[in-house]
Amino acid sequence: MTEQLQMTRRTMLAGAALAGAVAPLLHTAQAHAAGAAAAAGAAPVDISTLPRVKVDLVKPPFVHAHDQVAKTGPRVVEFTMTIEEKKLVIDREGTEIHAMTFNGSVPGPLMVVHENDYVELRLINPDTNTLLHNIDFHAATGALGGGALTQVNPGEETTLRFKATKPGVFVYHCAPEGMVPWHVTSGMNGAIMVLPRDGLKDEKGQPLTYDKIYYVGEQDFYVPKDEAGNYKKYETPGEAYEDAVKAMRTLTPTHIVFNGAVGALTGDHALTAAVGERVLVVHSQANRDTRPHLIGGHGDYVWATGKFRNPPDLDQETWLIPGGTAGAAFYTFRQPGVYAYVNHNLIEAFELGAAGHFKVTGEWNDDLMTSVVKPASM
């Protein structure tokens, strides 16, 4: 039996054991919830009576069309994501990994719903893949965030539904028992935004409306090296597993990047805006702390831990997003030019790749900044 098949079988067996352990707990929890609802006089929701909408997800940094304020009552929002194991080049030198992805991108797509909507996800693991996968939504309640109910082997699919009860931005990620770090640091994570039904609010409770939204997924990679210090390449994910674990245990990333690769949000792929545009940036890091900073700008309104029931912090220079969290920052651009958006651990930004650009068009405002004396010889 090859190392790859041994590893795959081990993953499947672990997943089966986990499902067996969780099932009795899940049955007990469901019975308790039903009893509590009956005692409180709350009628169970008849899902069949709710309107349904199908959403086509888009590749980050872009986000699918959505209403900022809910126009109806709660509804069932249907998504489909296909798991894709693929080779991915993560820097300009051609360093290659076996990425594990939701819908083929690192990060996976940003999903947007409103508070008290029902998220219904069809999760597909094609038979072209080699590993068991699942999904853990930090926005969900119960069954390991859905991870215990969504374990799919290659050639299988499943559908999960959960109620989005907490407004905010939240991480989701793959979480197969015993291999969670490997899957997450191979790119298998993303975010979901649960908007308040009446939209975002400032610290005084006044509406905040954005003109554009971008999703930045920060990813730490741990690429094994050979004895000469060169990055290794592997034919299959299973072949890389033991070396990948050794690299992860150093707790020292070889790359920390935005949206899957060094430079993925720079140059022709830079994020764009215009002076006066209000931009919301959702930023997630499923594994490590990060410190977003917009060089030349600020966070006018910031939810660093991403939870919209809390009033935003104002006028932030840098904000801390803990590992395993998504945050959100709202900024109105006031000057044209190129802005660097970075993780302000500057080693991680400039040496490891955690940086992107905003290209902003418009008229320069001398009142905000001007060159009084141009650089010249003394």
From Swiss-Prot:
* Cofactor(s) the record lists: Cu(+); Cu(2+); FAD
Q: Which GO terms describe its molecular function?
A: copper ion binding; nitrite reductase (NO-forming) activity
Name the SUPFAM superfamilies on file. Answer: Cupredoxins (SSF49503)
Q: How many and how are cofactors bound here?
A: Binds 1 Cu(+) ion.
For this UniProt entry, which residues form the secretion signal? 1-38
Assigned keywords, A-Z: Copper, FAD, Flavoprotein, Metal-binding, Nitrate assimilation, Oxidoreductase, Periplasm, Repeat, Signal
* Cited CDD domains: CuRO_1_CuNIR
Residues at which Cu cation 2 binds: 138, 173, 344
Post-translational modification here is noted as: Predicted to be exported by the Tat system. The position of the signal peptide cleavage has been experimentally proven.
* Domain Plastocyanin-like span(s) in chain numbering: 39-213, 214-378
* Coiled-coil regions listed: none
User: What Pfam families does the record point to?
Assistant: Cu-oxidase (PF00394), Cu-oxidase_3 (PF07732)
From the Swiss-Prot or TrEMBL record, state where the protein is found: Periplasm
The text the record gives for the protein's domains is: The type I copper site in NIR plays a crucial role for electron transfer from pseudoazurin to the type II copper site of NIR, which comprises the catalytic center of NIR for the reduction of nitrite.
The entry describes its oligomerization and partners as: Homotrimer.
Protein's name according to its UniProt entry: Copper-containing nitrite reductase
UniProt source species: Achromobacter cycloclastes
Lineage, top ranks: Bacteria, Pseudomonadati, Pseudomonadota, Betaproteobacteria, Burkholderiales
User: What is the name of the gene encoding this protein?
Assistant: nirK
